Regions:
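Catalytic domains that recognize anionic headgroups
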Residues: 1-381
Length: 381
């Protein structure tokens, strides 16, 4: 069995992949995410099931569990609170790190429902962001280069076959640190677009939009460099997959970035680039649900019956579903890449194998919720 390397990057839009020349140098598929922000999207990717997006948590058997049972050494380096072990993301990994302290302990420090209530108000969110700017919070995460360094070291130390999952955060707003980042005032202004802004004008000018886009493209270029370096310096010749958890909006419908609580399913948010190198895929479009069965199947590993994705070596995906959950309601989008049907802010449940599950509030440790707020979320959703 061949080594498998999966790289996911935050906030990469399909129509901006030209800013990533290494990634764009491969055959790039148009992928549709199963969730609208990091946690439900990556949960569904790793679980191969739409239910994981509905519940916003990884559900076994995950890709790491399946490959681990087949004899793979499994390594996950995912520097975001959205992939905390409290949400099941560590399942199946021999080595897993999301670089957050105090996470993964659901018995400690349950969050305050009152604080959660306050976090739903634009005024509270904007005050919080003025005190704790996004750039400062992103600077607390390890740089992509450091994550790639560790990934190379961990991968080379492990016995083959090896499965490595790396998530890169350098493409998350404000698209850098220091002079690379969007200025704090502009970042806050863009975040408030589409809603009520309590501290001055909230309309982003054309010039300001170009500033944001330039920073975004530069960030994508830096991420691309790290993806190239990872594959160049790793021991061996792995099968390689690349995808993004979601995209970002840049004012096309008045909104900027990805903001889970808005339950947005616009194409800039849910259409992402997908690369499968060393795996012959049919078709030009896919769902991120397809990655787990395609990666496992390409190595001769039997895919579990609960997985709903398509093995892209054998068939095409012609329809996709995206669930945008937040608290007890969700927006759901169905599309066939030509038409799109959206049900907004609905009570959503899913029946699978005789069991019905619905969209619910996440109940997580206070430390994890604080880390999520630092990434721009009002609460854990």
């Amino acid at each position: 069995m061949r080594d498998v390397v999966l790289v996911t990057a935050d906030s990469v839009r399909r129509d901006f992949v030209d800013a990533m020349p290494f990634v764009a140098g491969h055959e790039v598929l148009t992928g549709v995410t199963a969730g609208n922000y990091t946690r439900p999207s990556l949960a569904a990717l790793q679980s191969g099931r739409l239910r994981a997006a509905v519940e916003s948590r990884a559900i076994g058997p995950t890709l790491a569990e399946v490959l681990g049972d087949a004899g793979y050494a499994t390594i996950g380096l995912v520097p975001t609170a959205q992939a905390d072990p409290a949400f099941g993301f560590d399942a199946g990994f021999d080595r897993y790190d999301n670089y957050m302290s105090g996470g993964g302990n659901p018995a400690k420090n349950r969050r305050s429902r009152f604080r959660e209530f306050l976090g739903s108000f634009d005024l509270v969110r904007q005050v919080y962001r003025r005190v704790y700017p996004m750039e400062a919070n992103m600077a607390d995460l390890p740089e992509d280069a450091a994550v790639i360094d560790e990934a190379i070291e961990r991968f080379d130390e492990a016995d083959p076959p090896r499965f490595l999952w790396v998530h890169l955060m350098g493409s998350h707003r404000p698209y850098g640190t220091g002079e690379d980042a969007i200025p704090g005032a502009l970042d806050r202004k863009a975040e408030a677009s589409g809603g009520r802004h309590w501290f001055g004008a909230s309309e982003v000018t054309a010039e300001e939009r170009e500033t944001i886009l330039a920073a975004y493209r530069d960030a994508l270029g830096r991420v691309d460099d790290e993806v190239r370096r990872l594959l160049r310096e790793l021991d061996g010749d792995p099968a390689f997959a690349f995808a993004a958890d979601h995209g970002d909006e840049f004012g096309e419908e008045g909104y900027y970035y990805h903001q889970g609580y808005r339950r947005r399913v616009a194409d800039p948010v849910i259409r992402v680039p997908v690369v499968l190198d060393g795996i012959d895929a049919v078709g030009e479009c896919c769902s991120l649900l397809d990655l787990a069965p395609t990666l496992a199947g390409s190595q001769g590993v039997e895919t579990p019956e609960p997985w709903q994705g398509t093995d892209l070596r054998e068939d095409t995906t012609d329809e996709t579903v995206t669930v945008a959950p937040w608290r007890e309601t969700a927006t759901v989008a169905w599309q066939d890449f030509e038409r799109k049907l959206v049900a907004r802010d609905a009570d959503v449940s899913m029946t699978e194998g005789g069991e019905t599950v619905g969209v619910e509030r996440a109940d997580v440790p206070a430390e994890v919720e604080a880390q999520l707020r630092d990434l721009g979320y009002s609460d854990a959703g």
